[in-house]
């Protein structure tokens, strides 16, 4: 295939993947936009940073972009805010831009306010999937909130909780009616609600439970009763979970692309920390069940994405969801998980290590703002800079001077010499000679006949002077040493130092500055998040916007009406005139505009 045709096909295929593109910020070294494509978002995003570093404002920027793109993509989102500031900022922004967002299906859930209630019956009848799966996920979510690693350590709670939920589901009731099923003294209502169950295990269990003495029943159910208390005691949660009419349906929310903004802050004292955590955990567990009921498409682009933003996620994400992050993309759930530092995950109960490992491995894109502590910085340095740190990087080189080679050359030698000498000699002498002469005959000396005497005197002087001069020239071979520098030793930069430098880069960052490495990137980049403008929205404008939004939702009702419906239903149960078996969800009267 021609390469141009191939890449043209690839570009066309990339455009067909549904979802929203996000602009994370500006790459500060180049000034270019750092973007996440819909395909990149499917592998999830992890954001962490200390308080005041820009993490929350970045999340707000991303949520705004998703809402602005709703008219084009129709992709929904769930935003869970444990502090309330993100919720307030988004409501103010949407109220200010109300005209352009009036067709976006906004679902605000605020645990701080008591005027309106979002009906959320977790025991609602499900059109798809096996209710046993939803019930089991509900049980696991409750166990997680109470710091239990699944239900293998609490088999009694698991069994009793399932028996309670099966009875409520088959009788088309709500979680509030669990208080009648756990009544230790009056078992009349309990017996009525547990008669004729089609689920064999639940029917068998209640047949045994209903013949227990009050003392034995209390011994069986006391622990389970304690775990249901947040649903039964906290008024805000009672009103939400106690509606058996039209309910928030996360399966429909995914299909319709609803934007659910949940403020689970404990500010105002309307809900406890335990209750807020339970609500958020149940919401996420229900979302996971709904996504699995929708199923996967045959191709990656067949499933419309649903975006999930969770700040301080370690308090709400169950191990079941965490360990299945790699599967979540197939079901269309694309998560953005945020917290202050990684070690928070490890400290989140018995399941912390499991959630930590799953998030670090499966959230393939990461943005890290300034944070502290070696125990937090080190794993992120490894994750962000892996493949960039060079173990062959030279830190120090030592050189020594050595004879590199010997060169043979010729050298001309010239010499000059001069010499001189002088000498002087004086001599004198005297010589006297005497002699006799005779004959020798027959061997005998005869008398001398001759005598001779002579003498001589002599003297003299001699002088000598010698001078000489000479020169010579000759060529002789010589050997010359060529000196040079030779590397004698090399010290490579140790991995510990490379990690330390990476940790320093993460630590030493200004506000709104972060280090990002998205899935598919070969190296991390320094980025600056965009400035998120604060809207000049007044409280009156925000309240008016919320009222219009609530009035359009068929499952939103005034809290007074919600309380009245619960009282009427419970009076019927107590009086014995319950029509629970024949109950069908009835939409509350709602102004639709």
Task: Say what each PLM segment does.
Residues 1-14, 187-196, 219-223, 392-593:
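Conserved P-loop NTPase motor module
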Residues 4, 8-10, 14-32, 38-53, ...:
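P-loop NTPase motor domains
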Residues 87-89, 317-318, 345-347, 375-380:
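Extracytoplasmic/secreted cell-surface and envelope-processing proteins
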Residues 90-94, 346-361:
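Short regulatory helix/loop adjacent to the ATP-binding pocket of P-loop NTPases
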Residues 122-124, 345, 363-367:
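Short beta-alpha connecting loops at secondary-structure transitions
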Residues 333-336, 461:
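Hydrophobic multi-pass inner-membrane translocation pores used for secretion
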Residues 338-344:
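Conserved H-loop
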Residues 353-399:
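Conserved P-loop NTPase catalytic core
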